[in-house]
């Protein structure tokens, strides 16, 4: 008869994980598809030891956020709402006006909406750096450039 042993589940601690930096060019890519790929990397779902309640994901740098595109007529019809917290203080912007005022905001809003709500989501969002132009200030991190098919990240 075999001796029965207790199997122990090993939990990876966030401090022991070495975070990589990825560079994504958002020029001429659909807003939602870029956001889905970025959130997957931020959460760490591309890793074998993914755990939903820990920050085991990597850091992401997005360039050319102002050149992201939308399908259909969403450029004029998509609305973004914000409130001043005063009575009657609801404001709305279209994608076009918001991207003229803050070029990185539509992509950041889409990514933030896909992350978990709460302290973990706020920590994950801090791992994201978005730049409207083609230059970024994080060259010292030696980011790995990802091409169009981001679902193949290992």
From Swiss-Prot:
* GO MF annotation terms: mRNA binding; structural constituent of ribosome
Lineage: superkingdom: Bacteria
Alphabetized Pfam families for the sequence:
Ribosomal_L13
Annotated disulfide bonds: none
Task: List each coiled-coil range.
Answer: none
Q: Which GO terms describe its biological process?
A: negative regulation of translation; translation
Assembly notes: Part of the 50S ribosomal subunit.
Name of the protein in question: Large ribosomal subunit protein uL13
Q: Give the organism, scientific name.
A: Borrelia garinii subsp. bavariensis (strain ATCC BAA-2496 / DSM 23469 / PBi)
- What lineage is this protein's organism placed in? Bacteria, Pseudomonadati, Spirochaetota, Spirochaetia, Spirochaetales
């Amino acid at each position: 008869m075999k001796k029965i042993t207790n199997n122990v589940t090993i939990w990876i601690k966030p401090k022991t994980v070495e975070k990589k930096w990825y560079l994504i060019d958002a020029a001429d890519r659909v807003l939602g598809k870029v956001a889905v790929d970025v959130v997957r990397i931020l959460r760490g779902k591309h890793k074998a030891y993914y755990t939903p309640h820990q920050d085991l994901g990597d850091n992401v740098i997005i360039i050319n956020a102002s050149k992201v595109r939308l399908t259909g007529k969403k450029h004029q019809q998509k609305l973004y709402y914000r409130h001043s917290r005063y009575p009657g203080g609801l404001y709305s912007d279209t994608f076009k006006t918001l991207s003229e005022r803050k070029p990185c905001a539509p992509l950041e809003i889409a990514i933030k909406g896909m992350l978990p709500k709460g302290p973990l989501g706020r920590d994950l969002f801090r791992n994201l750096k978005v730049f409207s132009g083609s230059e970024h200030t994080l060259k010292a991190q030696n980011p790995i450039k990802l091409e169009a098919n981001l679902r193949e990240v290992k």
